[in-house]
Amino acid sequence: MPILLSRDNLKKIITVTDAIQAVEEGFRHYKGGHCDVPVRKEMRLDENQGIFLFMPAFMKPGNVFGTKIVSVFPNNLQRGLSTIQGVYMLNDPTTGELLALMDGIFLTSLRTGAASAIATKYLARKDAAMLGIVGSGGQAAFQAAAICKVRPIREIYVYDTNSQNARDFSETASRDLTPVSYTHLRAHETNPCIS
């Protein structure tokens, strides 16, 4: 019987530090040619204005095979659902047996934050104490938490066109990580930067 791991389960068993170490190890194995990571396959459901993304991977060290399946349905906002949903399946690569089903969105956010921390670890100054984050959506907290593990961050600046999201992020990160300043940018102020 496969193990089912929800977001709450995963939060209890995987730390940001664990994620950084695992992702860095995965990068080393990938660079060493020990991983098989095919190009992401997508399936569009135009009639429902959605898309499914399939991302399998096999890592020879550890004999690990997993597949992430993500769906993106922008109209879910009107349904009160998240636009992005996902699951991660872990299979036994010898037998194909399903070992676990895990919340794919939490793992993706944790992995993406960890990847940013690894880039920061090797590319940023050792004494970097300020962090700038553009956008305060769901990924922002993971980025901040991971980067705070590899640098002595004392201030975080967040910019967002949604002032409520920026305030919410600022309050949470100030409580959990380090003081956060935020700036609210209205869309018309950002357009010159984009065009």
Could you tell me what each predicted segment is?
Residues 1-109, 117, 127:
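N-terminal ligand-binding/catalytic initiation module
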Residues 3-5, 148-152:
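Acidic/polar active-site rim loop that often engages polyanionic ligands
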Residues 116, 128-148, 160-161:
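Glycine-rich adenosine-cofactor-binding loop
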Residues 179-181:
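Acidic, proline/serine/threonine- and glycine-rich low-complexity intrinsically disordered segments
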Residues 106-128, 165-177:
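Conserved N-terminal glycine/acidic-rich loop preference
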Residues 183-190:
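Conserved small/polar residues in nucleotide/adenosyl-binding loops
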Residues 151-173:
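NAD(P)-binding Rossmann-fold cofactor-contacting core
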